[in-house]
Curated annotation (Swiss-Prot):
Acetylation recorded as keyword: yes
Disulphide bonds in the chain: none
Record-stated family: Belongs to the universal ribosomal protein uS2 family.
Organism: Candida tropicalis (Yeast)
Protein's UniProt name: Small ribosomal subunit protein uS2
Residue ranges, compositional bias (Acidic residues): 222-244
Lineage: Eukaryota, Fungi, Dikarya, Ascomycota, Saccharomycotina
GO molecular function annotation: structural constituent of ribosome
HAMAP family xrefs: Ribosomal_S2_euk
UniProt-annotated stretches for the region Disordered: 212-261
GO biological process, one term: ribosomal small subunit assembly
Length: 261
């Protein structure tokens, strides 16, 4: 697929894809994914052609932008590393996010409370999101998937070749897809305007790591505040010399004795 010159992969985006390890595929190759292999390293790892990855991102974004109602796009991720990414993608594009376990019958059983009728489904991994793809095939819903070299392509209409197992790779692909959708819709005015959202927002973060960082920051603040509090409350044990006669003030004991009881 050839793209117009304005849609070409920029050097900055190419560096992002390489920095996020999007180009590192699996050692096994499924027959339909062979066109996306750039070459194979001596250790057996297949290098993905990031030019093909970018072409599929642009194609997928045009498909998403062509749907009038953004809520009719369902984004799914059973894989832990992709759940934060799909939630952020849904927040920025208006899609419907299904993060975590996909409940069987979401697309086919209209009796369930979670029943949905999307016009397009996007999944993070065809293996972990196999149930969503299977139900989409029953009701003729097109599917866009992030596929590694060993991912099955059955019932997948548009495959975005990438490393769909690394947290940085998954987050970066969803970020690029969201940015391209906003460009296609005209929310980002032109292709030279930078998007204010950073790719880091789409990366998976370990809850325990977040709590640990928060605890360390709180501990650091306490250690900084402790010396200041000690300096404020330090008592020297000295009293000011006051001349009661000159000031016109009398000690409390003399006042009590002079008063009329």
């Amino acid at each position: 697929m050839s793209l117009p010159a304005s849609f070409d992969l920029t050097p900055e985006d190419a560096k992002l894809l390489l920095a996020g390890n999007v180009h590192l595929g699996s050692k096994n190759v499924q027959v339909h994914n062979k066109p996306y292999v750039y070459k194979t390293r001596p250790d057996g790892v297949n290098i993905i052609n990031i030019g093909k990855t970018w072409e599929k991102i642009v194609l997928a974004a045009r498909i998403i932008a062509a749907i009038p109602n953004a809520n009719d796009v369902a984004v799914c991720s059973s894989r832990t590393f992709g759940q934060r990414a799909v939630l952020k993608f849904a927040a920025h594009t208006g899609a419907t996010a299904i993060a975590g376990r996909f409940t069987p019958g979401n697309f086919t059983n209209y009796i369930t409370r979670s029943f949905k009728e999307p016009r397009l489904v996007i999944v993070t991994d065809p293996r972990t999101d196999a149930q969503a793809i299977k139900e989409s095939s029953y009701v003729n819903i097109p599917v866009i998937a992030l596929t590694d070299m060993d991912s099955p392509s059955e019932y997948v209409d548009v495959a975005i070749p990438c490393n769909n197992k690394g947290k940085h790779s998954i987050g970066l692909i969803w970020w690029l897809l969201a940015r391209e959708v906003l460009r296609s819709r005209g929310i980002i005015p032109d292709r030279t305007t930078e998007w204010s959202v950073m790719p880091d927002l789409y990366f998976y973060r370990d809850p325990e790591e977040i709590e640990q960082n928060a605890a360390e920051e709180a501990k650091a603040e306490e250690t900084e505040e402790a010396p200041a509090a000690e300096a404020e409350t330090e008592w020297t044990g000295e009293t000011d010399d006051v001349d009661w006669a000159d000031s016109g003030a009398t000690p409390a004991a003399e006042d009590a004795a002079a008063s009329n009881w």
